Amino acid sequence: MSGVNEIRSSFIDYFVKEGHEAVASSPLVPQNDPTLMFTNAGMVQFKNVFTGVEKRPYSRAATSQKCVRAGGKHNDLDNVGYTARHHTFFEMLGNFSFGDYFKDRAIELAWNLVTRTFELPRDRLVVTVFSEDEEAYGLWKKIAGLSDDKIIRIPTSDNFWSMGDTGPCGPCSEIFFDHGPNVPGGPPGSPDQDGDRFIEIWNLVFMQFEQLPGGERLALPRPSIDTGMGLERVSAVLQGVHDNYDTDLMRALIAEVAELTSVNPDGPQKASHRVIADHLRASVFLTADGVLPSNEGRGYVLRRIMRRAMRHAQLLGAKDPLMHRLVPVLVREMGRAYPEIVRAESLAEETLLLEETRFRRTLERGLSILEEESTGLTSGGQFPGEVAFKLYDTYGFPLDLTQDALRARGISVDTTAFDAAMARQKAEARASWAGSGEAATDTLWFSVRDEVGATEFLGYETEKAEGVVAALVRDGAVVDSLAAGEKGLVILNQTPFYAESGGQVGDIGRVSGEGGVAAQVVATQKKLGDLFVHEVKVETGTLKRGTALVLEVDHARRAAVRANHSATHLLHEALRRVLGDHVAQKGSLVAPDRLRFDFSHPKPLSGGELAEVETIANRFVLRNEPVETRIMAVDDAITSGARALFGEKYGDEVRVVSMGTDDGNGAPYSVELCGGTHVKRTGDIGLISVLSESAVASGVRRIEALTADAARRHLNAASAALAGTAAVLKAPVAEVEARVATLVEERRRLERELAEARKKLAMGGGGEASGDAVRTVGDIKLLARRVEGIEIKDLKGLVDEGKKQIGSGVVAIVGVTSDGKAGIVVGVTADLIARFDAVALVRVGSEALGGKGGGGRPDMAQAGGPDGAKAEAALDAIAAAMAG
């Protein structure tokens, strides 16, 4: 029985033969126990069975339970890699009795397994019992035939187990393997018990009491059994090695690390090989169970594990991402026992690759800062907690990674100051957000943010990922679920969906997952700076908190947005080259169907300038050069020439997007600080077509443009229209512009002639004013006429013409428009201004037309009214006013 897989199978097979149900491992994320970060023992999935809350169709069970201890009080992370038996991920073999057999049968089954099935020498086995458990002491003597010196009484809580302050509890009995006197260490309970000579391989818990508040214990009517055997530990014993990392499974992983790094796994860097092997298992199994790296909760613990391994890969000299290349070996070794990692193999590889790629970009700078800040520290010194927090907050360095990097130098970290900095940041964030325009939902989003943490954005690297529903909101309140047909807001632990910001619209797409749930993502917004909120409409199933989902961004739409966003960068720089360095971005809209770019410039662009801007931008599109993104300190980025845009708030670390190569000096053509999504190469933009240029405000201009397919369709339509025009004109395309210009000028000439003809016709054909249009009011001539087909702006010209015709008098002309409204102009010849005021007369006419007011000079005034049908009445009213 040499292999770990055979040992696991033998354990399960043994208990199945003894009437136990083989129960599959439960997930690493406890399904019904919010008090636990991760499943850390075999009994976790049976907790409700032991307490009587849940019934199972069997009373005996055997499992091989996957476990993680890397957070909370069960945190082995710091020791992993440096000791023989510490792990973040491990397997716990166990057999359980739910009110069926008890101590005697449990001891008999355990003894027979280790001595008969596993064939461990009896004389190398030692057991412990709780000092008050005389029954267990007697049973070991009776069943196993152990002498008194092989049964050790332990008076401490090490041999008394409890589920909590209240609930089931009972004494324990542990089985130890003695490696012999050549190995340092003493027996359990002795001052030297922490040595490697005596290794615990199995713990039997006899649940026989119920702990009541106040300290009283009652005997359980149906006592139960819970046992746990560490597979890694017992495998080391059975394989004759003293170190869990020397078992066949771990050596297979370590050997692959050594192969890929060309570093001796048993040399000075042995610990790094072990860290990677252990953390690989935790990373893959957690990913398979729906945990993905993030900055809060379980995802943060996973990120710490991954990044600690990645840091050790870097110490081994790995130049490229390493962790994802180890996944196939792990799947080969453990996939038969745990088929979930077979199903999740590609997801695990993708997640590890993305995480390591992201981490490597910031690792070098973070380590440089760590080195600078710790230069004056020597062994025994303490690294400032505030600096450790900056490394965490700005560069994604978990605290334990900083501790691990300083460990070799004997330097500790001031964790109290680290915690204080963390608390201070949260308080400042709340204060700075006050009055930001989201007051109505501040409390809600801060509450959600505190509970679920920041959303991890994956969209720079992928458009499809897996995520877990962290919170749901409907009608301004947190809810437990969203049913089919309902709309609401979904917050995920991580997302590939870009949230609207920096002028770029948010992504849309679909999510789907377990239980047949599917929903449309119709918008993605950002709250509090780092909380991504997905507006969804559930189509089928029910979205619940904790639901694992496949997240798919609308690829075509995202591609169009990327093209438009990258085009704004090219256009921005082209505008600076054509118009001058005063050009600065003042706003933008990056949508899938178009782009809009606002910039500072004092006057309209000429046609030549606009064409030159478009030509320059398209020159870099045609070159199809790479678009590069770097993560830099904001000060370094700006010093290097990157353009920081208006109104943007930047952290200590920024994304710098560069594209194109300048013809003059070989430097990047465009370099900007930008958090948006971009094409991989400028050629992916396809084409840039500028549609228009206009004014937005004083000193601010706007250009609108299309890219890619939208630009192509626009140009195709324009080309078709041009060809159609040429056909109508019966002229070659090259002559269309000149022919159209000629036609336009001819039209204008004809329109002028027509207007003159209408004026003459309106005034009686060009001679003296016709008698029927001239009235005599007292001794004053009044030329009053209603006209149609004359633009209102031309009425003054008609009045001037009328004044010439009558020599002395008043002229009143009402022009009726095609929509039934009217304009009225009144003129008074110079000799009569002392008697008649044109303004007063036009107001009388306007009132008759249903209007109010009017204005002008005593000799010429204008007004209007909504009712052109009252034109004659208006003229009569003016005549009456003159007579009055």
UniProtKB/Swiss-Prot annotation:
Binds 1 zinc ion per subunit. PANTHER family: ALANINE--TRNA LIGASE, CYTOPLASMIC (PTHR11777:SF9), ALANYL-TRNA SYNTHETASE (PTHR11777). This is Alanine--tRNA ligase. It is found in: Cytoplasm. It comes from the Bacteria. It is an enzyme of class 6 (ligase). Its cofactor is Zn(2+). CDD domains: AlaRS_core. The keyword Transferase does not apply.
